[in-house]
């Protein structure tokens, strides 16, 4: 029996607009957008929401490469060179948007990301857990061409939007 396993259903319903707005200020800037945060803080959901927002803004889905490294269907990309070659072979000369979820699973991920940024017209967004991608390492690994967005778990306001509790007294 085949069963689709989704992330926690409440997490999908919360649009993290504040984070989206902050990140999208840097859309099409020559800087790698790095989304970090503790486990289960919503980094993957936020990256999916970013993809959806780009499509809403008129970016063709064909111009967005979304790579979920948690999915075994992408296990061949654990080898960073395979991922690099795959993206390069599909590049048609127009700007593409590259989104890599859980980038730390890719060998030499920093070289892959930096090479893509240098070699093709692209806008790159990556996620990773704080345990694997530390702010202090980013500037040296990616030669300083990054901006980091620290994602926190749902706020009280966001929990109230979900109907969890009815106010500060709950």
Segments and roles (model prediction):
Residues 1-170:
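Phosphate-binding site recognition
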């Amino acid at each position: 029996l085949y069963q689709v396993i989704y992330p926690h259903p409440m997490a999908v319903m919360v649009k993290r607009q504040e984070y989206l707005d902050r990140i999208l200020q840097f859309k099409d800037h020559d800087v790698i957008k790095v989304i970090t945060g503790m486990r289960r803080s919503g980094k993957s959901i936020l990256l999916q929401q970013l993809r959806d927002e780009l499509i809403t803004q008129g970016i063709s889905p064909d111009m967005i490469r979304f790579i979920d490294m948690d999915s075994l269907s992408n296990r061949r990309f654990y080898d960073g060179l395979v991922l690099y070659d795959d993206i390069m072979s599909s590049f048609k000369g127009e700007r593409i948007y590259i989104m890599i979820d859980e980038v730390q699973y890719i060998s030499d991920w920093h070289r892959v990301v930096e090479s893509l940024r240098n070699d093709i017209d692209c806008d790159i967004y990556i996620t990773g857990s704080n345990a694997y991608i530390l702010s202090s390492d980013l500037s040296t690994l990616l030669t300083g061409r990054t901006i980091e967005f620290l994602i926190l778990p749902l706020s009280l306001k966001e929990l109230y939007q979900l109907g969890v509790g009815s106010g500060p007294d709950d």
